[in-house]
Swiss-Prot record:
Coiled coil: none annotated. Residues 93-121 are annotated as: Disordered. This is Tachykinin-3. The keyword Protein transport does not apply. GO terms for cellular component: extracellular region; extracellular space. The gene is TAC3. InterPro entries: Neurokinin-B/TAC3 (IPR003635), Tachy_Neuro_lke_CS (IPR013055). Tachykinins are active peptides which excite neurons, evoke behavioral responses, are potent vasodilators and secretagogues, and contract (directly or indirectly) many smooth muscles. Is a critical central regulator of gonadal function. Residues 96-108 have a biased composition (Polar residues). Keywords: Amidation, Cleavage on pair of basic residues, Disease variant, Hypogonadotropic hypogonadism, Neuropeptide, Secreted, Signal.
Amino acid sequence: MRIMLLFTAILAFSLAQSFGAVCKEPQEEVVPGGGRSKRDPDLYQLLQRLFKSHSSLEGLLKALSQASTDPKESTSPEKRDMHDFFVGLMGKRSVQPDSPTDVNQENVPSFGILKYPPRAE
């Protein structure tokens, strides 16, 4: 969860830096005819997107902070199934205190005693 929070912070800083660099440019260019240049509508749309993304970014940060405060309750059955699947692939089993694993040695197949041929030197 910390990785997700770190990624969000880096994303927020990079967005703020990129939009900050755009806003530092001159906002209004005067055309000799007394009108405004064609960049003004684009700048207006860019500022609108910045404002909309700021509010959605706040919502994203709120959701991430709520998720990071209580990570144990947010585990879904799908996530648990995927965890069990990968643990099974790796061959590692965690012993749960409520489910002991007793292995009966009689039921375990064995290859018997391995005999090596005498060394020929």
